[in-house]
Amino acid sequence: MTERQSSFSYNDLIDSSNGKMWGPDNAQLPAPPMLMMDRITHIDDETGEHGKGQIVAELDIKPDLWFFDCHFKGDPVMPGCLGLDAMWQLVGFFLCWKGNPGKGRALGVGEVKFTGQITPDCKKVRYVIDLKRVIQRRLIMAIGDGRVEVDGKTIYTAKDLRVGLFKPGEMA
């Protein structure tokens, strides 16, 4: 059995965004500024709340992050949709890490709740995804539950995050 990498540095994530990690016609993380994490600290396919795998990543908050200047003027807050997108990014990364081919696309989410916010005075965001189901047949898809924590407090939760991988020509 081949031992897979269980954590990824910022440079590794940039390699993914440049298409160097999984090869041509396969998923890649978005490039900055849409890359919403600085590192993946843990990834496995056996633990997590549902026993199907877990992925954990972090984003260091700096007051000069691009979205604070425009969302909102005089009341800077990280857009909640960026935290949601980060969770989709991680579910797609998990599918590729498992060795699946194709380009990743977010397919939906069952429920999202926001109970806090990320502001320039925060220090660290932590994303945690617990995989619930991984389908690796003709359809390649993962479903997971996620949470976004800032400085140790959970501020967003998402149930049934869905991401699929598609080969060229399969995407409409």
UniProtKB/Swiss-Prot annotation:
GO terms for molecular function: (3R)-hydroxyacyl-[acyl-carrier-protein] dehydratase activity; trans-2-decenoyl-acyl-carrier-protein isomerase activity. Keywords: Cytoplasm, Fatty acid biosynthesis, Fatty acid metabolism, Isomerase, Lipid biosynthesis, Lipid metabolism, Lyase. GO terms for cellular component: cytoplasm. Its EC number is 4.2.1.59, 5.3.3.14. Pfam families: FabA (PF07977). Necessary for the introduction of cis unsaturation into fatty acids. Catalyzes the dehydration of (3R)-3-hydroxydecanoyl-ACP to E-(2)-decenoyl-ACP and then its isomerization to Z-(3)-decenoyl-ACP. Can catalyze the dehydratase reaction for beta-hydroxyacyl-ACPs with saturated chain lengths up to 16:0, being most active on intermediate chain length. This is 3-hydroxydecanoyl-[acyl-carrier-protein] dehydratase. It comes from Maricaulis maris (strain MCS10). The gene is fabA.
